[in-house]
């Protein structure tokens, strides 16, 4: 289904003026951007001679109070629109306005005194701009849903704008021309997607919600209101009639009343207000501030500086003397150094006054300090190394020390090159026969050393390197102690204490030497002999392996 639109009937003066007014209100609604120096005006509007083609693709629902359909629109006509405005060409003005919008509400008159007032850089510099839109090509598919209670809804399935030509007074500048082209294409795309459906929906609600009875009632109320304004006088409202209870809280009113009552006194010592400088104390306050110009003249014996008289006295005395820096190039370094020292001293004086005259806390780190000797002299034994039960510290200096192992010895000893001759003890007279069970190996704790006559390797010797148990006086596998164990006296010589070796040291060299003998001992464990060979070997004087040989048989 399709139909033609008589496009020539739109070229009327009333429709053109109404469209211009509607577009002007729509373009100037809301907050104006800071880049524009004036409002937007419709300079020229022409619908052209060629109208769009409108085609209905589908009608989903059709009734007296509702309608839903899908349509297609195509337009390639000679419609053109010309806009006129003024653009702000001062970038500093634009930056200042944007900063005020982000940080301070510039529409509030109470905030004007805290904002800087620039002179030349803040002046507007407006340039006229004429923007012409022509050669518009539109091709889109939309959905229309109408309801008498919900109004008219228009939604496009795609972006209907195909192309548009933008020409302006800045076409000679290619960068600005490209920028305007891209920006306007984006804005017209948003117009078809969001702005146009919203405007059509709001406009439809305005007319569909009013029936004949409601419209007549509204018209009668408007007429009566206009008549009352002409005949009746307006009532005057005094300040006493204003109820401030809803505008101000009781807490704020109480605080303001206390501040007001504190000043209604003839007392000279008026209580001070926090973070407030009163005008009556302003001169005293300015006297305590450092005067940069006078201090420079006093310290460096410089001539007086001529500063602009329009500046306030406090700012005049404390500003950096530009004329002094320009006229004294030879003494520039000294002047800057003096200014830095004055500012530093002023900062520390202010800091000390806030801290009631106390100096600021500084973190002090002392490097290369001497170690105290009191701790070492008081506890000299603390410097000796402490070792645990399983300590494996090594004493390389004790080369003569050996380690003993508890081993199972064979009843028969093999011929060895390093056998040691031990003296045979005299047999004791027994009252009965002593029988020895030679079938089981004898568990002994013999300790072989390089010198059999030396007593230094005895477990009771103080210089022995044998393994010890934990604690003083603990015998190693039930060895009896022949001498009383006593602790050593406390020595004050630090060198001897530092070089003192513990009894728990193990000589690795001796362990490595004994590993060769341990291989032969393992072979001894594999041999097994009978009782006859055992007694024969024990009676021979050549084999003295046992520490205590069995006594010969006796008859009683």
UniProtKB/Swiss-Prot annotation:
PROSITE patterns: SMP
Membrane topology: Multi-pass membrane protein
Compartments in which it is found: Mitochondrion outer membrane
GO cellular component: ERMES complex
GO biological process: mitochondrial genome maintenance; mitochondrion-endoplasmic reticulum membrane tethering; phospholipid transport
Residue ranges constituting the SMP-LTD domain according to the UniProt record: 1-205
Keywords in alphabetical order: Lipid transport, Lipid-binding, Membrane, Mitochondrion, Mitochondrion outer membrane, Transmembrane, Transmembrane beta strand, Transport
Gene Ontology molecular-function annotations: lipid binding
Domain free text: Lacks alpha-helical transmembrane segments, suggesting that it resides in the membrane via beta-sheet conformations similar to those predicted for other outer membrane proteins and porin.
Function: Component of the ERMES/MDM complex, which serves as a molecular tether to connect the endoplasmic reticulum (ER) and mitochondria. Components of this complex are involved in the control of mitochondrial shape and protein biogenesis, and function in nonvesicular lipid trafficking between the ER and mitochondria. MDM34 is required for the interaction of the ER-resident membrane protein MMM1 and the outer mitochondrial membrane-resident beta-barrel protein MDM10.
Subunit structure: Component of the ER-mitochondria encounter structure (ERMES) or MDM complex, composed of MMM1, MDM10, MDM12 and MDM34.
Family indicated by similarity: Belongs to the MDM34 family.
Protein name: Mitochondrial distribution and morphology protein 34
Source organism (scientific name): Debaryomyces hansenii (strain ATCC 36239 / CBS 767 / BCRC 21394 / JCM 1990 / NBRC 0083 / IGC 2968)
Gene this protein is translated from: MDM34
């Amino acid at each position: 289904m399709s139909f033609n639109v008589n496009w020539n009937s739109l070229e009327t003066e009333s429709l053109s003026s109404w469209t211009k007014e509607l577009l002007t209100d729509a373009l100037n609604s809301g907050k104006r951007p800071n880049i524009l120096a004036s409002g937007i005006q419709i300079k020229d509007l022409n619908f052209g001679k060629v109208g769009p083609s409108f085609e209905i693709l589908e009608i989903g629902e059709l009734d007296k109070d509702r309608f839903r359909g899908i349509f297609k629109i195509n337009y390639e006509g000679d419609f053109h629109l010309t806009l006129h405005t003024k653009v702000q060409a001062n970038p500093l003005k634009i930056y200042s306005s944007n900063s005020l919008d982000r940080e301070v509400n510039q529409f509030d008159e109470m905030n004007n005194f805290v904002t800087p007032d620039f002179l030349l850089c803040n002046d507007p510099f407006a340039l006229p701009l004429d923007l012409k839109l022509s050669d518009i090509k539109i091709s889109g598919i939309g959905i229309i849903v109408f309801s008498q209670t919900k109004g008219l809804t228009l939604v496009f399935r795609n972006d209907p704008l195909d192309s548009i030509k933008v020409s302006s007074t800045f076409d000679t500048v290619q960068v600005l021309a490209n920028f305007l082209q891209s920006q306007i294409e984006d804005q017209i795309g948003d117009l078809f997607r969001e702005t146009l459906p919203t405007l059509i929906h709001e406009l439809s609600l305005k007319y569909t919600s009013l029936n004949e009875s409601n419209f007549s009632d509204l018209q009668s109320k408007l007429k009566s209101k206009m008549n009352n304004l002409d005949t009746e006088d307006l009532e005057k409202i005094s300040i006493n009639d204003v109820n401030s209870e809803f505008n101000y809280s009781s807490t704020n009113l109480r605080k303001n009343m206390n501040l007001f009552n504190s000043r209604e006194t003839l007392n000279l010592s008026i209580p001070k207000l926090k973070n407030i400088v009163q005008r009556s104390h302003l001169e005293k306050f300015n006297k305590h501030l450092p005067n940069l110009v006078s201090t420079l003249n006093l310290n460096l014996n410089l001539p007086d500086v001529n500063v602009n008289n329009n500046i306030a006295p406090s700012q005049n005395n404390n500003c950096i003397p530009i004329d002094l820096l320009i006229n004294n190039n030879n003494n520039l370094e000294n002047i800057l150094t003096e200014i830095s020292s004055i500012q530093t001293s002023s900062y520390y004086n202010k800091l000390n006054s806030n801290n009631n005259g106390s100096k600021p806390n500084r973190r002090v780190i002392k490097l290369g300090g001497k170690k105290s000797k009191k701790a070492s002299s008081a506890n000299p034994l603390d410097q000796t190394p402490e070792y645990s039960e399983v300590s494996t510290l090594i004493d390389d200096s004790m080369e003569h020390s050996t380690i003993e192992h508890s081993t199972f010895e064979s009843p028969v000893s093999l011929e060895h090159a390093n056998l040691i001759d031990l003296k045979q003890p005299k047999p004791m007279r027994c009252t009965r026969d002593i029988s020895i069970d030679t079938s089981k190996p004898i568990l002994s704790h013999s300790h072989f050393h390089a010198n059999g006559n030396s007593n230094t390797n005895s477990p009771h010797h103080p210089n022995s390197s044998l393994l010890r148990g934990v604690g003083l006086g603990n015998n190693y596998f039930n060895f009896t102690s022949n001498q009383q164990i006593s602790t050593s006296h406390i020595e004050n010589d630090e060198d001897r204490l530092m070089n003192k070796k513990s009894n728990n040291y193990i000589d690795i060299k001796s362990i490595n030497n004994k590993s060769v003998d341990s291989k032969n001992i393992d072979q001894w464990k594999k041999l097994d002999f009978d009782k006859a060979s055992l007694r024969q070997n024990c009676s021979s004087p050549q084999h003295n392996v046992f520490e205590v040989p069995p006594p010969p048989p006796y008859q009683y």
